[in-house]
Amino acid sequence: MSMWEMVLALFAVVLFTSISLGYNQALWRQTDYLNNATLVVQANHICHSVLDEIDAKMFSKDLNFLNIVSMFHDSTRVVYYPHLQQSFTVKIAAINSDSLGHSLPNPNSIFKTVSVTVSGPSALKHNVSLKRIYTKTNM
């Protein structure tokens, strides 16, 4: 094998390695995006289920409007999903608020804001947070 053929073989190896490395990095990045999207959807579902639980308790009269803050202020839950083999931390914060969701010192306001924040495994890049403003309807 001549020197020219060895140089061509070396260039072929370098070219093939760089192409396969670029492809593998793109595949890894897409897999990471897909895992993050799956966990964001799951975290969003957890937020909605907590807020829907509060709605159901209020609708069935198991929860009084004035007790929302005392029951859900700074509470934390851990939810484990065996099919994902992941656990999520759910933080619930309830405050007395105005119609825009800004905090008020008055405990008898007609608006309550409940914020649910879900944090999870490292594949979930950012915490997912949802807010709902509840209004006292029977004055």
Where does each model-flagged region fall?
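Low-complexity, Gly/Pro-rich coil/beta segments used as flexible assembly/activation regions
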Residues: N36-M139
